[in-house]
């Protein structure tokens, strides 16, 4: 399955999600490869850091050297693509090959507007997968304080956008994600019993229900 993790607006946390998902899949025994199409190359940097620190499982991250869609479709396992608006040509090509698009949306009106524009681009410019491309959005970097209304308001606004499914599993803004990246590790590798780790397991299990278990 080809999952493209994308958003028009910067700062959505897509590279962090892509990295944690890639390691989560690998830790469940899945064959997974990643494509880093973002000029910032965060996913590639994290994979290189893991290699230097000899952290297992090792991640296999590729850049594009040929026709992108052919590369993506050549892999038999799970494919994760990290791409943003800074590489619009690659984004459009990746979206054309995607089985599903995962859109992380921080809790703000500006991010809702960006998501709305992103959906317009998909419908206008992207040749849909013949089997249908699933469009999934979720609130990323959600407020940990439940009394702050922006998270719920963002989720409600996303639910009003046509043609998109809103995942109920939020990823909250926790320092564990930021700190673990500096070590080339995921939040569930460094702090397996933390709130952030448990929230991510729930989130990933919803995306891959056939792997709905915490790895031993």
Spans of model-derived segments:
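Conserved catalytic-core segment of NTP-binding enzymes
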Residues: 3, 28, 33, 84-169
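Hydrophobic positions on the alpha1 helix immediately C-terminal to the Walker A/P-loop
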Residues: 16-17
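Active-site catalytic microenvironments for nucleophilic, acid-base chemistry
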Residues: 24-28, 121, 206, 210
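NTP-binding/hydrolysis catalytic cores, primarily Walker-type P-loop NTPases
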Residues: 184-216
